């Protein structure tokens, strides 16, 4: 059965399984989450530092969850390589746009 998390661009069965193991069961569970903290928790759970690309996927996933009409460019995980999410200074990112 396909996970509801697989609707997130760039998230397949394996990444959805990681998200679920961290207690994220649906897209809305990502709203208000800190991608850096989710990445840290993933690394701790696995017992090693996961590739930084996983951090970029977390950033894209949280962005997707928080923006009903997302900028399509920002749905690519590689967009987030050199960009933090939420952008610095944006305190209430869950209410952005």
Please tell me what each predicted stretch does.
Residues 1-11:
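Sterile Alpha Motif
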